[in-house]
From Swiss-Prot:
<feature type="compositionally biased region" description="Gly residues">
    <location>
        <begin position="637"/>
        <end position="653"/>
    </location>
</feature>
<feature type="compositionally biased region" description="Gly residues">
    <location>
        <begin position="141"/>
        <end position="161"/>
    </location>
</feature>
<feature type="compositionally biased region" description="Gly residues">
    <location>
        <begin position="553"/>
        <end position="617"/>
    </location>
</feature>
<feature type="compositionally biased region" description="Gly residues">
    <location>
        <begin position="365"/>
        <end position="389"/>
    </location>
</feature>
<feature type="region of interest" description="Disordered">
    <location>
        <begin position="213"/>
        <end position="672"/>
    </location>
</feature>
<feature type="compositionally biased region" description="Gly residues">
    <location>
        <begin position="171"/>
        <end position="191"/>
    </location>
</feature>
<feature type="compositionally biased region" description="Gly residues">
    <location>
        <begin position="425"/>
        <end position="469"/>
    </location>
</feature>
<feature type="compositionally biased region" description="Low complexity">
    <location>
        <begin position="538"/>
        <end position="552"/>
    </location>
</feature>
<feature type="region of interest" description="Disordered">
    <location>
        <begin position="141"/>
        <end position="193"/>
    </location>
</feature>
<feature type="compositionally biased region" description="Low complexity">
    <location>
        <begin position="470"/>
        <end position="486"/>
    </location>
</feature>
<feature type="compositionally biased region" description="Gly residues">
    <location>
        <begin position="243"/>
        <end position="263"/>
    </location>
</feature>
<feature type="compositionally biased region" description="Gly residues">
    <location>
        <begin position="487"/>
        <end position="537"/>
    </location>
</feature>
<protein>
    <recommendedName>
        <fullName>Putative per-hexamer repeat protein 5</fullName>
    </recommendedName>
</protein>
<feature type="compositionally biased region" description="Low complexity">
    <location>
        <begin position="390"/>
        <end position="424"/>
    </location>
</feature>
<feature type="compositionally biased region" description="Gly residues">
    <location>
        <begin position="215"/>
        <end position="233"/>
    </location>
</feature>
<feature type="compositionally biased region" description="Gly residues">
    <location>
        <begin position="663"/>
        <end position="672"/>
    </location>
</feature>
<feature type="compositionally biased region" description="Low complexity">
    <location>
        <begin position="618"/>
        <end position="636"/>
    </location>
</feature>
Length: 672
């Protein structure tokens, strides 16, 4: 039969009549093997050591221990020994660990204060009683900012031709030719993307504050102008001046290149000696910019809360060709005024999608910048469109976590204090640059009128990635102060290239007093993104692959490459009228008209796009855990900077109109 002898003492009768005794938890048998005594004597023996976690009971309830008769676990009748020990442990790895174990009679409170650092103060007194007070306070603020800027420029040229023919029935004859030059406009694309991601995590009994601000701006401009003048003089009684002027202007975040030709024919017949005085105004309405396609693209992408601005403008100026024939007898002036209707399809595709998105989560600072520059040049007659798309993608991620946890038991008899201070900083930086070039040429021939268009588009995109992480590890024991500062830095770069080519020709033949016209158009499109793809007219095939892998722990690097190519060609001829088109993995257009003997069209397209992407992270973490009475506030800052670089080239030759688009994406990620 079991017998309870008090203080948790249980005796059991053994089979042989002997008595076997057991003690409840917290007690042990005395030497007489019949009585139970408490295992723990009241002493100052437990000294705080550093752990990976701070444990502290904010309100300790225990009783002073003395040798005597116990009435229950944790309860003691003190016999005059009231001094005790407080074990206080400092902070390790952004976590303050304090273990306070109290055995004694009294109440306890533990105080932990953290303001960007973890400071733990533990005070206890014991004189038969133990008192521990504690408060945990952690404050944290994080700010994230991301900016992106992209610029692009493009140039184009055009030609205008004026022809004057003079025939004098006299002694002298003169033939003059006037040539005018029309202007094309290049393409510039600026894209700014700002993406900011911040994370603030606060765990513990208390309050936390996280504030993140992100801004992204993308701007691109391109301008091109051109003029052409032609003067013609015939020696004899007939003097003819022909002037052809063509101008084309395209402006936008992307600008298009346009060229135009103007042909004016003036025929003067003079009867008699030294006559043939006819003003053959070879107005060849020098159509500058047949189709000035200005394509401006500003793309800003992000996720979350933030602001992003993008501006895209495109203007196109178009003129046409006109032919005039005038005949006069004597000093009659035959003015052949050719009005050229410039089909200025100013497609200025100003895709100014300023979707500048900034995603912010939590606390910290992430800053990333990306720059992309794409240039395209188109030369020839007709219209060339080049677009350089630069995309700057900035991703900044910063996480600050502050946690204070206080758990455990307090065994305190006496007084002790402890202080732990932790400081950690993480910085991530990534830089990248991107350039893109594009060239285009176009030719047009015809006894009547011929136009040629060339388009070149180049885009460059680059992405830089930087990652940095900082770790702060602090160990403090009891009375004392520990301060640790850690920094981490990481950089990453990314590059991308893309090429595209396109060709096209147009010819026209006219005879008699009529005129023949021929037009040709060429367009090219190529895209190369991290996994590049592209399209071109005629037959254009673009392939591009890009891979961006980023790993960041303390130090992170990221690289990305992308390439794309596109080519297109087309030709067309007609007797009276005709059309031709070329098709491929893109678009091809053919236009033909003849108000004379024949006309023909041809298309050519080439575009290339390259994209490189890199990613980096910078991380700074401060963790404090606290359980008990008090407030916890976490403060931490992290900075991440990412810049993207990409390059792309595109060339296109052809007639009439070509459109090319190139985009570049730069991604920078910074985490703190």
């Amino acid at each position: 039969m079991n017998k309870d002898h008090g203080c948790g003492h249980i005796c059991k009768e053994a089979p042989r009549g002997s008595v076997a005794c057991e003690c409840r938890p917290g007690f042990e048998l005395a030497k007489n093997q019949k009585d139970c005594i408490c295992k723990y004597e009241l002493s100052i023996s437990e000294v705080g050591t550093a752990y990976t976690e701070v444990r502290k009971t904010t309100t300790g309830t225990a009783t002073g221990i003395a040798t005597g008769t116990c009435t229950g676990t944790g309860r003691v009748k003190a016999t005059g020994r009231g001094t005790g020990t407080d074990t206080d442990t400092g902070t390790v790895t952004a976590r303050a660990t304090v273990t306070a174990r109290v055995t004694g009679t009294g109440t306890g409170t533990a105080t932990v204060t953290e303001t960007g650092t973890a400071k733990v103060t533990d005070t206890g007194t014991g004189t038969g009683t133990a008192k521990v007070t504690g408060t945990a306070k952690v404050t944290g603020t994080g700010t994230g900012t991301g900016t992106g800027t992209g610029t692009g420029t493009g140039t184009g040229t055009g030609t205008g031709t004026g022809t004057a023919k003079v025939t004098g029935t006299g002694t002298d004859r003169g033939t003059g030719t006037g040539t005018g030059t029309g202007t094309g406009t290049g393409t510039g694309t600026g894209t700014g993307t700002a993406k900011v991601t911040g994370t603030a995590k606060v765990t513990g009994t208390g309050t936390g504050t996280a504030k993140v601000t992100g801004t992204g701006t993308g701007t691109g401009t391109g301008t091109g102008t051109g003029t052409g003048t032609g003067t013609d003089t015939g020696t004899g009684t007939a003097k003819v001046t022909g002037t052809g002027t063509g101008t084309g202007t395209g402006t936008g975040t992307g600008t298009g290149t346009g060229t135009g030709t103007g042909t004016g024919t003036a025929k003067v017949t003079g009867t008699g000696t030294d006559r043939g005085t006819g003003t053959g105004t070879g107005t060849g309405t020098g159509t500058g910019t047949g189709t000035g396609t200005g394509t401006g693209t500003a793309k800003v992408t992000g996720t979350g809360t933030g602001t992003g601005t993008g501006t895209g403008t495109g203007t196109g100026t178009g003129t046409g060709t006109g032919t005039g024939t005038g005949t006069g007898t004597g000093s009659g002036s035959g003015t052949g005024t050719g009005t050229g209707t410039g089909s200025g399809s100013g497609t200025g595709t100003g895709t100014g999608s300023g979707s500048g998105t900034a995603k912010v989560t939590g606390t910290a600072t992430g800053t990333g910048t990306g720059t992309d520059t794409g240039t395209g040049t188109g030369t020839g007659t007709g219209t060339g469109t080049g677009s350089g798309s630069g995309t700057a993608k900035v991703t900044g991620t910063a996480t600050t976590t502050a946690t204070v946890t206080e758990t455990g038991t307090a065994k305190v008899t006496g007084t002790d204090t402890g202080t732990a201070k932790v400081t950690g900083t993480g910085t991530g930086t990534g830089t990248g640059t991107g350039t893109g070039t594009g060239t285009g040429t176009g030719t047009g021939t015809g006894t009547g009128t011929g136009t040629g268009t060339g388009t070149g588009t180049g885009t460059g995109t680059g992405t830089g990635t930087g990652s940095g992480s900082g770790t702060a590890k602090v160990t403090g024991t009891d009375t004392g102060t520990a301060k640790v500062t850690g920094t981490g830095t990481g950089t990453g770069t990314g590059t991308g290239t893309g090429t595209g080519t396109g060709t096209g020709t147009g010819t026209g033949t006219g005879s008699g007093s009529g005129s023949g016209s021929g037009s040709g158009s060429g367009s090219g499109t190529g895209t190369g993104t991290g996994l590049g793809s592209g399209s071109g007219s005629g037959t254009a095939k673009v392939t591009g692959t890009g891979t961006a892998k980023v790993t960041g722990t303390g130090t992170g690097t990221g690289t990305g490459t992308g390439s794309g190519s596109g080519s297109g060609s087309g030709s067309g001829s007609g007797s009276g009228s005709g059309s031709g088109s070329g098709s491929g993995t893109g678009t091809g257009t053919g236009l033909g008209s003849g108000s004379g003997s024949g006309s023909g069209t041809g298309t050519g397209t080439g575009t290339g796009t390259g994209t490189g992407t890199g990613t980096g992270t910078g991380t700074s973490t401060v963790t404090v855990r606290g359980t008990g009475t008090g407030t916890a506030t976490a403060t931490g800052t992290g900075t991440g900077t990412g810049t993207g670089t990409g390059t792309g080239t595109g060339t296109g030759t052809g007639t009439d109109t070509s459109t090319g688009t190139d985009r570049g994406t730069g991604t920078g990620t910074g985490t703190a």
